[in-house]
């Protein structure tokens, strides 16, 4: 009978440990990084070869932020920091959000002339963290 009691006690203890381990949420497994450095954006001029054909390949790099398709107030508390890009061309009244990690912005069918591209690194709710503008002249198609 003593062996049976020990076996049942071991099974009960194992069940309690397994239950508490599986009840731990994913959020509690993430340790936030205190005092994260500010995001940094590096933008290069468009590649000259494609630009001669009216296509702008604008290389960029973001540090201290992961570009991801997430949004909303809860995502502001994710660590390491997440966000996305807002791209505005020639001061037009609209922009688009870029959630990819291609590190290149591609603009096609650019008309001849001067162009300006504003690239903003934003938090999950669209608040601007840093930005750069690249200007260039397109020979057009």
Locations of regions flagged by a protein language model:
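Short, compositionally biased P/S/T/A/G/V-rich stretches that sit at domain boundaries
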Residues: 25-56
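Short amphipathic, basic-aromatic surface patches that mediate peripheral association
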Residues: 61-77
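Short beta-strand elements bearing conserved aromatic residues within extracellular beta-rich modules
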Residues: 85-87
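Short beta-strand segments within Ig-like beta-sandwich modules, predominantly Fibronectin type-III
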Residues: 94-101
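Short acidic/polar inter-strand loop motif in beta-rich domains
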Residues: 95, 123-131
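Surface-exposed, short loops/turns at beta-strand junctions within beta-sandwich domains
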Residues: 107-113
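Short beta-strand edge segments in extracellular beta-sheet folds
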Residues: 135-141
